[in-house]
Swiss-Prot record:
Ranges of compositional bias, category Basic residues: 118-131
Purpose: May be involved in MAP kinase activation, epithelial sodium channel (ENaC) down-regulation and cell cycling.
Pfam family, one: TC1
Keyword Ribosomal protein belongs to the record: no
PANTHER family: ARGININE VASOPRESSIN-INDUCED PROTEIN 1
InterPro entries: AVPI1, Avpi1/C8orf4_dom
Record region (Disordered): 1-20, 75-144
Protein name, entry field: Arginine vasopressin-induced protein 1
GO term, biological process aspect, one: positive regulation of MAPK cascade
Length: 144
């Protein structure tokens, strides 16, 4: 029995030899050759209010490996999002204006709207408390 052709044959010409396809060697500090404006842009995109001052400090300390690590973490960070409406403003968005109607239907409508608000408050309370860790999860963290 002979050796299969796939083992004996040369790699296809479109595929480079493994030693050529190796990864580029990483620099000790990727920001060492960066310009001041590039570093400022990095801080500005991350939402930093003091981008110019921080960029100047980083640029002066470009040889320090701790600065490079901090900047890599900063680059991964996304800019801050707009804060959602607060609970008080969100509550106001559900308010409706009263329309003139019969007195009997108004009492029924008031009772049903109070039940709706109470059920929403209860579900919001459950959602808030759902993610709070209990004492068992705390003990689990201590044991391990």
């Amino acid at each position: 029995m002979g050796t299969p052709a796939s083992v004996v044959s040369e790699p296809p010409p479109w595929r480079a030899p493994p030693e050529v396809r190796g990864r580029k060697q990483a620099a000790a500090n990727i920001f060492q050759d960066a310009e001041l404006l590039q570093i400022q842009g990095l801080f500005q995109r991350s939402g930093d209010q003091l981008a110019e001052e921080r960029a100047q400090i980083v640029w002066e300390c470009a040889g320090d490996h701790r600065v490079a690590e901090a900047l890599k973490r900063l680059r991964r960070k996304r800019p801050p999002r707009q804060k959602p409406l607060g609970p008080s403003v969100h509550h106001c968005s559900r308010l409706r204006t009263a329309e003139p109607c019969a007195p009997q239907s108004r009492a029924t409508e008031t009772a049903s709207s109070e039940q709706h608000v109470n059920s929403r408050r209860a579900s919001a309370r459950i959602r808030r408390n759902w993610r709070k860790p209990g004492p068992t999860s705390y003990l689990h963290q201590i044991r391990h």
